[in-house]
Amino acid sequence: LFSSLEYARGKYEKPALISGVPVDNNNPDAVTYGGVKIRNFFLGTGDRVQMTGVPQECDKTHANILLVPAVVVDVLGIFYEGYQHAAADYDYSMMARRKGYPLFITGHACGYCEFDHETGRQEEVKLLKMTLKERKAYFRHPVHSTKDYLLAIRRMAPARYPFVCVGRFLNIYCPQLYYKLSHVRDDL
């Protein structure tokens, strides 16, 4: 973490947030968390930043392992407390970025974390098989919380908020239509 901090300071001559990259316990080549480079802010598309042996800049980052210099905390405070489970890390890192602080992931793994997340396709298949009642319960769960998701969008990308609200409504009530539209978005 500290060598990445020095790398970032040498590049920008200012404090940076450094996200330590955890890898899967059983597969050290599988990154479980890290940073994201945004491809299209309005559409909400991005790519996970990969470890290359040197720190990589990103647009938003997870906080499983996160080094935040004290001067950044003095300016931004700590994480927003309005979230149940998810999005506080993205929210904080994007707020830091907007204030001019660079974000980096480390060039090498800094820890282990089991990769237990579904791919987008796996989640799609699962949701399409669910009943309406099951989908509502799924999106009330803290890990998939509609409340957290919409709060995050409202705080990080307010121009997207009305579209994301419609998208979440479609994902719950008309998932087939939602995924058809989602695949078109992914191809843009």
Residue ranges and their predicted role:
Residues 102-130:
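Active-site donor/metal-binding and catalytic loop motifs
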Residues 124-188:
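Non-catalytic, C-terminal membrane-associated alpha-helical segments of glycosyltransferases
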Residues 3-7, 91-95, 148-151, 168:
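Alpha-helical elements of Rossmann-like donor-binding domains used by nucleotide-donor carbohydrate transfer enzymes
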Residues 46-68, 134-137:
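A recurrent flexible, glycine/aromatic-enriched loop bordering the glycosyltransferase active site
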Residues 61, 66-77, 82-109:
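A short, conserved alpha-helix in the catalytic core of glycosyltransferases
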